[in-house]
């Protein structure tokens, strides 16, 4: 009985790998026929260098109006890093990048919010691969294929419920470690844990930005772009302000 179960699991894993590899090696024009909606190429998304440059007066005023006291002191100016990050407001499942990050639950079997949206856009093949991963611990991350998504891969991470800085920081670090290990050069993050998990939005953004800045300081040659993807207007406002501190122009 045990041997039969092992063989069945092994067979399912092999089938899942075949399906994943089929999408990973598929020519781009052919893969685009499998997308379930619109897509945004990496080249169509402004770098922070250009985003800020196109709207500098409004963004500076916004920072002054919303932050009478800065939550952190501005980081040193490094123009090359400003071209490695982007701020995008919209649907993360539309991004044609190497990987998008899924704010998943411990089961990795889908849920509400961005988790459900990613599973719907990726198709049932994603769920089948996730079933083989035996879940994921809070603060950890695991990699799957992207299937019908414009993104090649999905990095699933489980954020903490409530304000637990070490665990949230671990989510971002683990995702970036996977990206570096797997030669994933463009990656998009949602706002992890800020929805029903209740992490305060500004506190979560500070951790995300600090972790990304630190990673880029040490690995900028291995990363083409890191995208902060917001959906709620409040998150967009927070990132528009705080990115001026972590990735200042002058």
Regions found by a protein language model. Name each.
Residues 1-250:
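Macrodomain-like recognition of ADP-ribose-binding/processing modules
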